[in-house]
Amino acid sequence: MGVKEIVSNRKAFHHYEVLETLDAGIVLTGTEIKSLRDHGGNLGDAYVTISKGEAWLLQSSIAPYRFGNINNHEERRKRKLLLHKYEIHKLDARISQKGLTVVPLSFFFSKGFVKVRIGCCRGKKAHDKRQSIIEREKNRELAAAMKRSYR
């Protein structure tokens, strides 16, 4: 059984330069899992913080399960990330460096469990964003030219 991506944080790739990625488990309730299976998540403003030796995902939004009842989950709540101690210490050291932050990049299913891909990122300046857009357009034009040449 492979990896199936549920929700991607496209905003993170635009605003940040991803230096390193890490996969983490996440503590969720039953209705949150069902909502994610229905692609009801958003990672737009989410970030990761470390407190008391535990990693937490903040400001992530998982839509309420539409068939849920009164026991439905809160949409924006603190969610605990499941990482080894050495990974948490490594992230804490990265967060303490100036200019670096840890943001979630995607939710995905792996062997039936929901995982979060988190990335250690550095913010892009406006000229860096323009440069990456120009680079992306060049690659797109090159791919289109290659496709036409094979016809």
Swiss-Prot record:
Keyword Cytoplasm included in the entry's annotation: yes
A GO CC annotation given for this chain: cytosol
Gene Ontology terms for molecular function: RNA binding
InterPro entries reported in the protein's UniProt record: SmpB, SsrA-bd_prot, SsrA-bd_prot_CS
Stored PROSITE patterns: SSRP (PS01317)
Single GO BP term: trans-translation
Pfam entry (one): SmpB
Subcellular location field: Cytoplasm
Keywords in alphabetical order: Cytoplasm, RNA-binding
Annotated function: Required for rescue of stalled ribosomes mediated by trans-translation. Binds to transfer-messenger RNA (tmRNA), required for stable association of tmRNA with ribosomes. tmRNA and SmpB together mimic tRNA shape, replacing the anticodon stem-loop with SmpB. tmRNA is encoded by the ssrA gene; the 2 termini fold to resemble tRNA(Ala) and it encodes a 'tag peptide', a short internal open reading frame. During trans-translation Ala-aminoacylated tmRNA acts like a tRNA, entering the A-site of stalled ribosomes, displacing the stalled mRNA.
Family named by the database record: Belongs to the SmpB family.
Protein name as annotated: SsrA-binding protein
Organism: Chlamydia trachomatis serovar A (strain ATCC VR-571B / DSM 19440 / HAR-13)
Lineage start: Bacteria, Pseudomonadati, Chlamydiota, Chlamydiia, Chlamydiales
